């Protein structure tokens, strides 16, 4: 089961140049507090970043789970944020990246 044996966490170049630190940290917060040990997670998670009345919503869904979940945060939404973000677990090395960077990992 993925995301249960964390050794290292990082964010790709594309992520750190397109999202502020507090948004990046929110992905780890969601995984640690709401997804890990609640759902059997795959090695690749996908989130959509949505505009919810000027605030950001993280939409999580998986083709392997019958559930999708929206996480509303008070961070301001920026239309320049990437619409989709992936989080990979590669044997305990967890990385947040843009979908177009997936071939690099």
Indicate where each model-derived feature is located.
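N-terminal "domain-start" segment
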Residues: 1-73
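Short, compact, well-ordered microdomains
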Residues: 62-105
């Amino acid at each position: 089961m993925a995301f249960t044996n964390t050794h290292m966490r990082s964010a790709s170049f594309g992520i750190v140049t397109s999202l502020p630190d507090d948004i990046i940290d929110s992905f780890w917060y969601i995984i640690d507090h709401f997804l890990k040990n609640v759902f059997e997670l795959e090695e690749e998670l996908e989130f959509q970043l949505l505009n919810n009345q000027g605030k950001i919503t993280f939409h999580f869904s998986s083709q392997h789970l019958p559930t999708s979940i929206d996480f509303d945060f008070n961070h301001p939404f920026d239309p320049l944020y990437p619409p989709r973000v992936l989080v990979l677990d590669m044997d305990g090395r967890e990385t947040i990246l843009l979908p177009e960077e997936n071939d690099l990992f």
